[in-house]
Amino acid sequence: MKDPTGRDADNIAFGSTLSNDRHADKSFDYLIANPPYGKDWKRDEAAVRAEHERGAAGRFGPGLPRISDGQLLFLLHMLAHAKEAKDGGSRVAIIMNGSPLFTGDAGSGESELRRYILENDLLEALIALPEQLFYNTGIATYVWVVSNRKTPARKGKVQLIDATSFWVQMRRSLGDKRREIPVERARDILKILRDFKDGDTRLVKKDGAGEETVVSRIYPTTQFGFRKITVERPLRLNFQASPERVARLEDEKGFQALAQSKKKGPAAEKELAEGWAAQKAVRQLVRSLTSTLFKDREAFEGVLDNSAKSTGLKLSAPVRKAILTALCERDETGAICRDKDGYPEPDPELRDTESVALAETVEAFFNREVRPHVPDAWIDTSRRDPKDGEVGVVGYEINFNRYFYRYKPPRPLEEIEADIRSIEIDIVRLLGEITGSLAG
C-alpha cells in the first residue's frame, strides 16, 4: 500500500490492534482514531486480559471496560504510545459514541477508566459533534482530546464544546450520513478550543431563528466525580403466632431441612423419621404460642425461648431463624431490631444509595439531603473506595447534555387554549361537511 505521494505506507500493519500491537516499541507526538462503536472485544479477550495483568508494563493496566464495548481500550492503546511528558508529551484525539462518557456505575471498569483519565489530568476537551455524520449510524458522537502536555491554563480543567449545531445538510445522503461539517465551521470549533473561554457563545439557528447560545463550558476535573454511598434504615418487625403466619413455617428452608437426608438405605429412613418427629415437635411448639402481636423482636424471642425450654425442645439456629422469619412482618411502628452488640440491623428492602459530589463531604450531604427526611437512617461506613479508603465508592461520569441544558418555559396557557379551541372548531366543521355529504 502506498500513500498519496507514492511512498510505501510502512506504518500500516495487519492484525487486531487490541491483541497484536504492531507498534509496541514506538511512541508518537499525535494520535487519532475512530474505533468501532459498541463493538465487543470477545475475540481479543484472552490477549487483552493477559496484558491487563501486567499492570503498568502493558497497555491495559488502568482497567478494562465491559466485554460488550471496546472503545476505551483503543484510547488506552493510544495513551500507551504517547511520549512521556518530560520528552514533550503527546496529544490524542479519538471519536467515540456517548457510551464511554457515562456507562458503568461507580467502581465499574468504565468508571475506573474515566477516573484514571481525569485524576491524572489527561482529558483536555470533549467536543460534541452533530448527529448523522457517519455512513453507518446517525447517533451522537464525541471527540475526546487527551493530552499529557496541557498548558498551565488548562491544568486541572476540562473544556466541553457543544458543536452539535455546526453542520449543513448534504445534497445527497450516504446511508445514515445526511450532514457534514463545512470547513469554516470546523475552523470555528478549533478556535473555540484554542480560545478556552468559559461561556463562549455562537449564533445558532434554532426553530428557524438565530439565537446566541453558549457552546463552551470549562469545569474542574473533580466536577465529574462522585462518591456512591449506601444509606441504611433500621429493620422494624412485628411477630405473631397467628394461623396464617404459622402456616408459612412449612415453606421455610430451615424447617424443611429437618426432614431431608443425604444418606441411603436404612440410615436415610432413620434420619427422615427423626426429622419428621422434630418437625412435629416444632409445629406443636409454634401452635402453642400466644397469638398476641409483639412489636419488639427481643420480647418475642424471650417468649419463644421460654416456651421451647418448658417443653424440653432444643432449637437449632436454622430452625429458630425459620420460626422467626415465618412469624414476622415488616412494621414501621415496630421497635428497631438490634444485633448482639446493640447496633440497629439494616433493612435490605429500605437500603438506598446516594451520589455525593466530590466537592462536598459525605457528612454534609447526608445531613442536608437525607437526615431531615429519614431521621433514623445512617451511612454504611463499611462500604469504602478500594483506592482511597474513604467512605463511598468513587465514580466518574460525564453527562454532557446536562451542562448545556437551557430551560425552555412552556407556552402561555392562553395560547394553548386558543389552539385547542381552533382545533375543536375545525373538527366540528369537518364533521359537518361529512354528515352533510352523507345526507346528500
PLM region spans:
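S-adenosyl-L-methionine
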Residues: 1-26
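Charged, surface-exposed alpha-helical interface/stalk elements
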Residues: 422, 439-440
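Residue-level recognition of alpha-helical coiled-coils
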Residues: 432, 436-439
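Conserved helix-loop functional segments at active or binding sites
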Residues: 1-4, 80, 84, 436
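A conserved structural/catalytic subdomain of Rossmann-like adenosyl-cofactor enzymes
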Residues: 19-21, 25-432
